A protein has these predicted regions:
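Structured adenosyl-cofactor binding patch, chiefly the S-adenosyl-L-methionine
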Residues: 189-226
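Short glycine/proline-centered loop/turn elements that form peptide/ligand docking sites
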Residues: 18, 97-101, 188-189
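Active-site/ligand-binding-proximal alpha/beta "capping" segment
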Residues: 157-186, 190-191, 201-203
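Glycine/charged-rich beta-loop-alpha catalytic/anionic-binding loops adjacent to active sites
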Residues: 15, 65-69, 175-178, 197-205
């Protein structure tokens, strides 16, 4: 069943955006039921006078018990967008674009990155709808490593290719968690030392060198969080 996030309820119906109505027309929904997600709850609906008339509420929760945050260094836009999509499918609740020492700073000039935020949010919403999420991940503004290290979540893991391979990701995760992934070239030794001094767990992702977006998805997929 097709799924759409909605933000406005009117009695026994949901108000549909122009984009959603257009999508429903394209897929020729007609009288077939579809799912609206409102305030993290699922509702089976049918199209009625360009609104989504509620048939019944569906009691399902597809979210992790804990907050799962991905702090990922800014990389080439197409790869960053791919990571946004896959991270959403894997259940992250928040994504923090990260500015690091080895970040390609050309990507941050002339609003190349910040001007894409609406597009990024659309990618997150589409991925959340596709993967039957109860909510869309939050995309924050750009942060530095120091800012992320100062966040209140205590359970943090940072990927580093130079650490011993035996330093694997522990299982399972039983509290809110932040995963930190660097850009192409990884984190600098200075950044790793700073993270370690702030009680961040430095972990290996194996003997092979992974692309930044692959490393992010590998970390998320390896963790048993539910």
């Amino acid at each position: 069943m097709n799924r759409f996030f909605v933000t406005e309820k009117n009695n026994d119906s949901f108000v549909l955006s122009k984009e959603t109505l257009k999508h429903l027309q394209v897929i020729r929904i007609d009288t077939k039921p579809f799912i609206c997600v409102y305030n993290e709850k699922f509702y089976e609906c049918v199209l009625d006078n360009n609104a989504a008339k509620i048939i019944k509420k569906i009691e399902q929760n597809h979210e992790h018990k804990y907050e799962v945050v991905l702090a990922m260094a800014v990389i080439k836009l197409d790869r960053f967008e791919w990571a946004l999509q896959k991270a959403t499918e894997l259940g992250v609740t928040k994504i923090i674009p990260l500015k690091t020492q080895y970040t390609n700073h050309d990507l941050l000039k002339f609003n190349k990155f910040s001007s894409k935020y609406e597009r990024f949010k659309t990618i997150l919403q589409n991925a959340a709808e596709q993967s039957f999420r109860n909510k869309i991940p939050v995309l924050t503004e750009l942060m530095t490593l120091k800012q992320v290290l100062n966040l209140s979540i205590q359970n943090k893991y940072i990927a580093h290719e130079k650490i011993d391979i035996s330093s694997n990701l522990p299982q399972p995760i039983d509290s809110d968690v932040i995963f930190l992934v660097g850009p192409e070239g990884g984190f600098s030794d200075e950044e790793i030392n700073l993270a370690a001094k702030n009680n961040v767990k430095v972990v290996s992702l194996g003997s092979r060198i992974l692309r930044a977006e692959t490393a992010a998805i590998f970390m998320l997929s390896q963790m048993k969080i539910d």
